[in-house]
């Protein structure tokens, strides 16, 4: 959770601080792959969202300053 909140904070600091709405968009981006591809993995009942998963899905986006996706 800390890593997710930190990602939202970094994006808020980089563009415009829109508070919790930014956290919502970060969570939405993080869950996008699971939402669209979970039906392909019917045998997997547990999906672990740990720091490694969060880093894999959010760090590149933040480091590349590809933040246009987070503008509401």
UniProtKB/Swiss-Prot annotation:
This is ATP-dependent protease ATPase subunit HslU. The keyword Cytoplasm applies. Its main location: cytoplasm. It is found in: Cytoplasm. One of its GO terms (cellular component) is cytoplasm. The keyword ATP-binding applies. Signal peptide: none annotated. ATP binds at residue 21. A double ring-shaped homohexamer of HslV is capped on each side by a ring-shaped HslU homohexamer. The assembly of the HslU/HslV complex is dependent on binding of ATP. ATPase subunit of a proteasome-like degradation complex; this subunit has chaperone activity. The binding of ATP and its subsequent hydrolysis by HslU are essential for unfolding of protein substrates subsequently hydrolyzed by HslV. HslU recognizes the N-terminal part of its protein substrates and unfolds these before they are guided to HslV for hydrolysis. Keywords: ATP-binding, Chaperone, Cytoplasm, Nucleotide-binding. It comes from Buchnera aphidicola subsp. Schlechtendalia chinensis. It comes from the Bacteria. Belongs to the ClpX chaperone family. HslU subfamily. One of its GO terms (molecular function) is ATP binding. Transmembrane segments: none annotated.
